[in-house]
Amino acid sequence: MGSKPWLHPAPQYKTLETFWDDEDDAPGPRCAHTLTAVAATKTHGPRLILFGGATAIEGGSSSVPGIRLAGVTNTVHSYDILTRKWTRLKPAGEPPSPRAAHAAAAVGTMVVFQGGIGPAGHSTDDLYVLDMTNDKFKWHRVVVQGDGPGPRYGHVMDLVSQRYLVTVTGNDGKRALSDAWALDTAQKPYVWQRLNPDGDRPSARMYASGSARSDGMFLLCGGRDTLGAPLGDAYGLLMHRNGQWEWTLAPGVAPSPRYQHAAVFVGARLHVSGGVLRGGRVIDAEASVAVLDTAAGVWLDRNGQVTSARGSKGQIDQDPSFELMRRCRHGAASVGIRIYVHGGLRGDVLLDDFLVAENSTFQSDISSPLLASDRTQQSSTPRFSYAARPPSGSEPSFSMSEGLSLDENSLEKLTEASAAEAEVASSVWRAAQLGAGTLDEEPSTSDASSPIVESTTDGTANEGDVRLHPRAVVVAKETVGSLGGMVRQLSLDQFQNESRRMVPMNNSDVPQPTKKFTRQKSPQGLHKKVIAALLRPRNWKPPGNRKFFLDSYEVGELCYAAEQIFMHEQTVLQLKAPIKVFGDLHGQFGDLMRLFDEYGFPSTAGDITYIDYLFLGDYVDRGQHSLETITLLLALKIEYPENVHLIRGNHEAADINALFGFRLECIERMGENDGIWAWTRFNQLFNYLPLAALIENKIICMHGGIGRSISTVEQIEKIERPITMDAGSLVLMDLLWSDPTENDSIEGLRPNARGPGLVTFGPDRVTEFCKRNKLQLIIRAHECVMDGFERFAQGQLITLFSATNYCGTANNAGAILVVGRGLVIVPKLIHPLPPPILSPENSPEHSGDDAWMQELNIQRPPTPTRGRPQPDFDRSSLAYI
């Protein structure tokens, strides 16, 4: 322990007092039930759902106690995390039969149940869903085609990659099983697929534990083999990008073999509790609590790292919680950094207590010395990588893109857009060039031919080299505020899917706004009103009637106050580390709140006193809360002018945001007259936004890229603001619209699929630009990337995208980059929220958000994933420049 202070021991459990109105609301003594965490909704905080189990046992001191099937139940109880109150639920619809030793998993605001055993024998393998949408509790029986896992009990199931229901092992009444099945919840009709995983397969077993880590690894732990012996091994099941699943044996030594135990993940730490040994003897006290730290690849107990299995005469100091946790067949779930345990069996005594442990040192999993580059190899062994490093010769597995991939239907929708996007991008470009009389302009020869200067130390406070942290920080795919502590670390080796990009789109020209406005003195505290109303990372909720809370006069005054600040800022900002960098938000205000909630927010109650914020543009369009997004960012700029920084994106232009949702949103939410007034005023403000930022003179941040025309930072600095796209500036067009080529093997300049006149630039251009300007890194936004961030040019350029599930179809993650004082850059990610599947009430036709996005996608669809073959009709436009 002394040499590895970042390895924190297993937590201590204690009894938690709970409340209920009637005795019927309390779950009472029971075992072999399930306890499942359900994320918070708009109207309710996080909950635990307790279902089924046995309320009576048979046998005595002379025999191994077993559940009495006549005492098995199908009652449902809900525990409110915030009020600590139990309530019995009586959902509508046909409930599943009474059962115990079944399996359960949360899917959004629903809980799925499968299998088990009851008074009538084995339960069927039907899937039952408890739907809690809008707090209207209802049972659904899910129709699944074809053969399934079959009736079984003592098995495990969880939702993997927020998409696949995976169930493994168990007992079919004749023997213990070793098979594995998966059901893709994103594809209808629903079909169980029997998996044929590669790798070291676990032996047949029952009464194991299984839990899915937030990045997509399903961990199987312990169990009882065919001879009745307890097992102490652990296996990870993961899916490669080609669809092939693989079992991998986990390293480390468990404190004890066990079965009929429970295990749940909190971040990267699997918390294991209770269990029994051969013959049904409850596990020894000192081994009753354990943690498998998957970030370090070691097992821990209350005293630290475990190097060998504990004997029954362990020398560990006794702790009251040891005896408390001696139990089996209990239920367990985690919410945030807390682990909850209910009931179970100890000897011949049914338990009804409710326990909690807090993984208070959990955040050290993210900031611990383990993350340092000289220790990255300690996290895995050659046979098993907790960072999901793939076997040699295969593609990396269960990366952020797993469960974030595009289905065929989504790809078809994206493909429809290439011609439309090319048309609008081309029209903007050609209109600007014709107006300036500079069509087919080439870069200045003086700039292009200036000598390349080798990078040298510039004497700034941060003299260390810029480097990307070896691990990214990823938060679970859950609703804001519900599982807010569910964070894990992901090795960057895993992000080899970084050439997959989606291209945002455009379509047709629109006149530049001409309406001018008179200015009045800005009301005192207007920006504070905005911050108070919107900066609510934990509990912000979309307005029910969609009416925006500011009127046009207030919008004008807010824009004026922010404009005065932007007018006095440089075109290229000079910034210092530490700083957080955000990519495209596109009106997805909920994602901004999630990022603030999980990784800190700009307030004196947050982290603004010691870290700055930089936003790279594209604040509006596409999402349905562009007004909230831009007004909050402007208010934060007014409140913290030296700490919050905004630069311009290509959607901060009237020609573009008239087409992709912002103008429509302003009219819809503010009325036609006030809406057009506000939309025009915002676009006047956008013309004053800075265009790039330098961090410590070593990192340049921009929205698009360097294109064909930008060779020096001075070219950007010379752009005079305010400026509109019809000014015909080739530098501005490249800065806001250009993209890197598809991958590092494609050098030089090539036409951009966005439209004629736009280009992509190769890694050679990036290297040349960095050398010439003594820079080490370019951070840019502009393109949707599946993992939220993507490296290019051997890591000299990073693309950053912060909005998740772009256009409602991309299913991408969102990310920010945290640039530390030592210029070490840590990517921090969020997944898209789980889709509301399996529920008629939550189908797309019932979702306002989906309807907004779908209608816009039909009119202005995004283009296909980067790297897909270009359609035959468009290949002629891809001549080399």
From Swiss-Prot:
It is found in: Nucleus. Residues 374-383, 445-460 have a biased composition (Polar residues). The modification Phosphoserine is found at S491, S839. Residues 368-407, 436-464, 503-522, 837-881 are annotated as: Disordered. Binds 2 manganese ions per subunit. The active site is at H651. InterPro entries: Calcineurin-like_PHP_ApaH, Kelch-typ_b-propeller, Metallo-depent_PP-like, MPP_BSL_C, Ser/Thr-sp_prot-phosphatase, Ser/Thr_prot_Pase_BSU1. Keywords: Hydrolase, Kelch repeat, Manganese, Metal-binding, Nucleus, Phosphoprotein, Protein phosphatase, Repeat. Mn(2+) 2 binds at D618, N650, H703, H782. One of its GO terms (biological process) is brassinosteroid mediated signaling pathway. GO terms for cellular component: cytosol; nucleus. It is an enzyme of class 3 (hydrolase). Phosphatase involved in elongation process, probably by acting as a regulator of brassinolide signaling. This is Serine/threonine-protein phosphatase BSL1. It comes from Arabidopsis thaliana.
